[in-house]
Amino acid sequence: MAEPLFSICVYCGSKPGDDPAFAKSAQQVGQWVAQHGGQLVYGGGRNGLMGIVADATLAAGGRVVGVIPRALVEKEWAHTGCTELHVVQTMHDRKRMMAERADAFLALPGGIGTFEEFYEVWTWRQLGYHNKPIGLLNLNGFYNPMLVFLNSVVQHQFLGPWQMDLIQTDSDALKLLPRLIQAAGMPTPFLSESI
C-alpha cells in the first residue's frame, strides 16, 4: 500500500444517532478519504459512526489508524480490521497520538467525547501548539445550538472572532474535506474536481 497523501483525524459518535444522514455522511467521509489517497486516524472503535467511517475507508481501499485505550479493548469495542490498531493506556495517550498522526481534524456528529476532542484540538490550535486545520461538519444543523452558544461567548468577550475563524464549518462533508486538506498544505491534485 502506498504512503498516504494526507492523514485526517475524524472525531465522531460511538453511536449512529437518530438520523440515517449521520451514517451516510460518515460513510461518505471514509470513502472520500480512501479515494483521494488519504489515511483515516480515529478512535479505534467498531461501533456507531466510528465503525462506519472506518469500514467505509477500508472498503474503498484506504488506510485506517485506530487508537484506543486498553479499557475499551477489554470491553470488546476495538475495530480489529484497522490497518494499524494502537492500544494505549489512557485517553490522554489516545488523543495525543491521534493529534500527532493527523494533518487535519474533522468532527462529525457525536456526543460528549466528540465535543471534548474537538474542543481540545481547537484549544491547542489557539494556543499555538499546532497549526492544523479543524473542521466541524454541521450536518442538518446538528451543531447549530453549539455555534449559537459559541457566538454568545464571543459577544461576552470570552472568545475573540479570530478564535472562531480557526474552525471551518460546512453542512456537506464533500465540500469541507478538500478545504481542510488544502489548508493543511497537503497535495491536492483532486481539488479541481471537488470544489
Language model features with spans:
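A cross-family phosphate/adenosyl-ligand binding-site feature
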Residues: 1-101, 139-174, 178-179, 183-195
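Glycine-rich phosphate/nucleotide-binding loop
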Residues: 108, 129-132, 140-145
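Arginine/glycine-rich "motif VI" loop of SF2 helicases in the C-terminal RecA-like domain
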Residues: 58, 124-132, 158-160
